[in-house]
Amino acid sequence: MRDPVDYFHNSLVPMVVEQSSRGERAFDIYSRLLRERIIFLTGPVEDQGASLIVAQLLFLEAENPKKEISFYINSPGGVVTSGLSIYDTMQFIRCPVTTLCVGQAASMGSLLLAAGEAGHRFALPNARIMVHQPSGGFQGQATDILIHAREIEALKKRLNEIYVKHTGREYETIHQALERDNFMTADAAKEFGLIDDILHKRPEPAAA
């Protein structure tokens, strides 16, 4: 049986109808925007959604390896390994990736926001950005719990190193900033180095 929540959300995705010499074609709005090299991360970061974003990044690179990709982020975060799969692909492909926070970029969402092309990481004025250390839970034998605790510590260190790379901050500064949930306005995120600028209006196209 189809998940009623999925059905509800999918039924609200608008369709765009285009006319051409070959007739009429209909696209869902996200597929139409993908043609303009625009990708969305909306909602929690998880394996299935991350795989779709990775596939879109690879497809757009194959289409044109030098043309910019715009990555819009509105996410509360989610699974660390899923987020890292997107992050690694962003760094792997040859296309520059512009990131833009609309709404919120929390946890892994903030890391992906910061991972955009230097000078091309943006947020809208009322966006909220939150950074913190990874969390997790595990039940089982004491030895297994210790193994998982060590894995979380290793992930924490790696995430700190990634934030250091993209913000230019010292490791200790990042370590302290991520000890607890750390919410920022767009202005604070810019000062911290997570973004490069705040966009109030879309820039006018350059005159021909």
From Swiss-Prot:
UniProt KW keywords: Cytoplasm, Hydrolase, Protease, Serine protease
Q: Name one GO biological process term.
A: protein quality control for misfolded or incompletely synthesized proteins
The reply to whether RNA-binding figures as a keyword in the UniProt entry is no
Q: Which reaction does it catalyse?
A: Hydrolysis of proteins to small peptides in the presence of ATP and magnesium. alpha-casein is the usual test substrate. In the absence of ATP, only oligopeptides shorter than five residues are hydrolyzed (such as succinyl-Leu-Tyr-|-NHMec, and Leu-Tyr-Leu-|-Tyr-Trp, in which cleavage of the -Tyr-|-Leu- and -Tyr-|-Trp bonds also occurs)
Which residues are annotated as active site? Answer: S107 (nucleophile), H132
Q: What is its main location?
A: cytoplasm
GO molecular function terms here?
Answer: ATP-dependent peptidase activity; ATPase binding; serine-type endopeptidase activity
User: What SUPFAM superfamilies is this protein classified in?
Assistant: ClpP/crotonase
- Name the Enzyme Commission number(s) assigned to this protein: 3.4.21.92
GO CC terms of this entry: cytoplasm; endopeptidase Clp complex
Gene3D superfamilies xrefs: 2-enoyl-CoA Hydratase, Chain A, domain 1
> Can you tell me where the transmembrane regions are?
none
Which Pfam families does the UniProt entry name for this protein? CLP_protease (PF00574)
Q: Where in the cell is it found?
A: Cytoplasm
InterPro entries for this protein: ClpP, ClpP/crotonase-like_dom_sf, ClpP/TepA, ClpP_His_AS, ClpP_Ser_AS
Family membership, please give it. Belongs to the peptidase S14 family.
This chain's function reads: Cleaves peptides in various proteins in a process that requires ATP hydrolysis. Has a chymotrypsin-like activity. Plays a major role in the degradation of misfolded proteins.
Subunit comment: Fourteen ClpP subunits assemble into 2 heptameric rings which stack back to back to give a disk-like structure with a central cavity, resembling the structure of eukaryotic proteasomes.
- The entry's protein name is ATP-dependent Clp protease proteolytic subunit
Q: State the taxonomy lineage.
A: Bacteria, Pseudomonadati, Pseudomonadota, Alphaproteobacteria, Hyphomicrobiales
